[in-house]
């Protein structure tokens, strides 16, 4: 073979290799996008929402904070909605509330799950469960609640209807999960409503005994929503993370065409305050982001049987001020932080209202989880 032909062959091989690499990179990017969307569905983060024409965008024009800048980090509120009407605005209670804090230098992302039954100050006046804020005023009210009570500077949000998760799981042919007797019974019960809302079918597990099962979209979403077992809302968070991991693993096995179909399917279930320019800016570093530590808030808590003037079950921080200190130590370990007067006032009010006080031996300490 002549040198000229060898050179041509080499060029052809290089071109083929470039095309393969381009396709592989595009597939990897789509996998990351979908993983982040799934994270958001379960209350985590979504950065790569490229097909923006299909998303619902809400401009947050009246975001408030307690005067804190928190430079060096980008904080995003993530809401997983329990929507029956496919409406992503106010009127929906948030099934999941999370905060994604991105270290702009290292690209590491820390996630904090705020327990939805946590009693916090709402609209600067009354006290209610954290998940009530979105229902009353939509994403802007919910973001302001997080900023006011936790001394944060969140400027953006992403909301996803949890029903989108059922679509994704069905399109990756389900996930396999090990269930307890109690979980099978509760999942079967949740499936009735989930099936009705999604219009999707499922097969009831009978007999309802412990075992390893392949779950379709309706079943997996129902499993992730179970609350009424040992561990309550805290155990529910563990289930959500398991569904996330299982779904992410299946996404990595899909081809480019399937990934595109999945994105087209779930985009109408996404609402965000990010502009196209902001999302593309985040997306350019998609491969550099690394999901790091996660924890739940509050760190120290009680669930009193009764609170004067309130009915139902509430999660009460054992000293909001002390818990917020721990939160900042978790999110920003190398930055000094002193609670604002706003957080101190809210903390004192919660103490007086609920008769739940901080542990004096733990006050001001940090327990990263």
Show the residue positions of the predicted features.
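N-terminal targeting leaders characterized by basic, low-complexity, disordered sequences
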Residues: 1-20
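Entry/capping segment at the start of metal-dependent catalytic domains
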Residues: 17-107, 281, 314
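Flexible, polar/acidic helix-loop-strand segments at domain edges
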Residues: 71-72, 170-258
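Extracytoplasmic
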Residues: 71-74, 91-97, 106-114, 125, ...
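Second-shell loop/turn segments in exported
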Residues: 85-88, 128-136, 151-156, 210, ...
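Extracytoplasmic/secreted envelope proteins and their assembly/folding machinery
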Residues: 96, 127, 139-147, 162-166, ...
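C-terminal solvent-exposed extensions
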Residues: 125, 269-369
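Amphipathic, coiled-coil-like alpha-helical scaffolding segments used for oligomerization/assembly
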Residues: 136-200, 273-275, 279
């Amino acid at each position: 073979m002549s040198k000229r032909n060898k050179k041509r062959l080499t060029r052809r091989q290089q071109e083929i290799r470039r095309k393969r690499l381009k396709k592989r990179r595009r597939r990897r990017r789509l996998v990351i996008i979908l993983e982040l969307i799934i994270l958001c569905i379960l209350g985590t983060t979504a950065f790569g929402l490229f097909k923006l024409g299909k998303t619902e965008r809400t401009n947050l024009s009246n975001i408030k904070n307690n005067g804190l800048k928190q430079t060096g980090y980008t904080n995003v509120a993530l809401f997983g909605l329990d929507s029956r009407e496919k409406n992503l605005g106010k009127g929906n209670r948030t099934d999941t509330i999370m905060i994604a804090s991105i270290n702009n230098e290292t690209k590491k992302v820390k996630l904090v799950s705020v327990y939805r039954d946590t009693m916090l100050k709402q609209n600067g006046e009354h006290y209610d469960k954290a998940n009530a804020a979105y229902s009353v005023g939509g994403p802007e009210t919910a973001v302001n609640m997080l900023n006011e009570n936790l001394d944060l500077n969140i400027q953006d949000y992403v909301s996803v209807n949890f029903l989108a998760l059922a679509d994704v799981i069905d399109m990756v042919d389900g996930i396999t999960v090990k269930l307890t007797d109690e979980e099978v019974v509760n999942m079967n019960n949740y499936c009735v409503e989930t099936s009705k809302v999604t219009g999707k079918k499922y097969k009831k597990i009978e007999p309802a005994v412990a075992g390893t099962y392949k779950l379709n979209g309706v079943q997996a979403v129902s499993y992730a929503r179970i609350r009424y077992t040992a561990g309550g809302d805290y155990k529910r968070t563990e289930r959500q993370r398991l569904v996330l991991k299982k779904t992410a693993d299946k996404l990595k096995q899909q081809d480019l065409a399937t990934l595109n179909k999945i994105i087209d399917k779930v985009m109408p279930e996404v609402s965000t305050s990010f502009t196209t320019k902001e999302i593309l800016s985040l997306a350019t570093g998609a491969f550099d982001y690394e999901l790091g530590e996660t924890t739940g808030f509050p760190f120290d808590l009680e669930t009193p049987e009764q609170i004067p003037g309130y009915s139902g079950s509430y999660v009460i921080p054992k000293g909001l001020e002390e818990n917020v200190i721990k939160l900042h130590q978790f999110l920003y370990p190398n930055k000094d932080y002193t609670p604002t007067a706003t957080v101190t006032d809210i903390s004192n009010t919660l103490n007086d209202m609920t008769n739940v006080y901080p542990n004096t031996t733990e006050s001001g300490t940090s327990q990263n989880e």
